[in-house]
A protein has these predicted regions:
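Bacterial N-terminal signal peptides that target proteins for export
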Residues: 1-7
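Bacterial N-terminal signal peptides
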Residues: 7-14
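Beta-lactamase-like hydrolase cores
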Residues: 15-52
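Structured C-terminal helix/loop/strand segments within mature extracytoplasmic catalytic/sensor domains
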Residues: 20-24, 98, 115-123, 163-181, ...
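Active-site-adjacent helix/loop patches that line small-molecule binding or acyl-intermediate pockets
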Residues: 22-24, 28, 32, 80-171
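Extracytoplasmic
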Residues: 23, 31, 51-53, 57, ...
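Active-site SXXK
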Residues: 55-78, 104
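Short, hydrophobic/aromatic-rich segments at coil-to-beta transitions
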Residues: 189-198
Length: 284
């Protein structure tokens, strides 16, 4: 067989793959101006001022805004009942089960947050966000959908002033702590409270892009995008993000994580150092 032909065929196979592997982009709100970082899996490759023209699809982030509205307007809980009628229920619950608001946000259950199911009218929605000087894309239910393209700057603006964001941040900590995202919790800890998102890159059904958006522990808004799904982005770049994301110097009250570690792994015995003798219980 002609070896030149083989090499040529291999090049055709690998070139599209290489083209899809774009650097991770991280937008971070700054005191003077917003920063845009480009990262490889090994670290930062470029830092610049965030362009006003950089766009992103909303993806699953629209659910975060519905969640904020529900919380801020004190809407009663309306659990979604899974009946096995929709393939989208894979993000929600098993047939015969139900899902509530907080869990739906973490799992990205779009069926729960559907405005029609929650009886959210276009007028009440628009008035609510207009009063808060939200971007035009957020004040319209017709544009609150995954394919809507918005500027990253306007997205960061909306996150900076999002109602009920303290509650959202508390709930979204579970996204990073998800044991299915191997290595993410050990790298990022509780430094980020984010809603994941995924969509089609440049509207091409065969190419996925994803990431997340939310806040650092101190409330600083951030946005991330990369090739692949949000889970792929988190697991692939957790180490690189660990190097660039700031570590909080102070932890506010209420930001600790309650873990029932010893309920699952009870202690059998506590011994003194270099001894097999059990330590007797004592106070002080």
């Amino acid at each position: 067989m002609n070896w030149r032909r083989i090499v040529w065929l291999l090049a055709l196979v690998t070139l599209p793959t290489l083209a899809e592997e774009t650097p991770l982009q991280l937008a971070l709100r700054g005191a003077q101006h917003d920063q845009l970082y480009q990262l490889s899996s090994s670290g930062v490759t470029k830092v610049s001022v965030l362009p006003d023209t950089l766009n992103t699809p909303l993806g699953s982030l629209w659910k975060l805004y519905v969640y904020a509205w529900l919380e801020d307007t004190h809407q009663p809980e309306q659990p979604y009942q899974c009946r096995g009628n929709s393939p989208e229920e894979v993000y929600c619950c098993q047939a015969g089960e139900s899902i509530t608001r907080d869990t739906a946000l973490v799992r990205s259950c779009g069926l729960y947050f559907a405005p029609q199911r929650l009886h959210i009218g276009a007028d009440m929605w628009g008035q609510y966000w207009q009063q808060r000087q939200a971007p035009a894309w957020l004040a319209s239910l017709t544009t609150l959908k995954p394919e809507t393209s918005v500027t990253v700057k306007s997205l960061l603006d909306s996150l900076a002033t999002l109602p009920a964001q303290n509650k959202a941040q508390e709930v979204l900590l579970d996204v990073v702590l998800d044991e299915a995202k191997i290595g993410v919790a050990s790298m990022l800890g509780s430094r980020v409270r984010v809603k994941t998102w995924s969509w089609f890159a440049d509207d091409k059904q065969e190419i996925r892009q994803g990431g997340f958006a939310g806040w650092l522990t101190d409330g600083t808004p951030l946005w991330v995008t990369g090739s692949g799904t949000s889970k792929t982005v988190l697991t692939r770049y957790a180490t690189a993000l660990n190097r660039v994301l700031p570590v909080p110097t102070q932890v506010a009250s209420g930001q600790c994580v309650l873990v029932d570690l010893f309920a699952r792994y009870p202690l059998k015995k506590v011994t003194e150092e270099k001894s097999t003798t059990a330590v007797k219980p004592k106070i002080g």
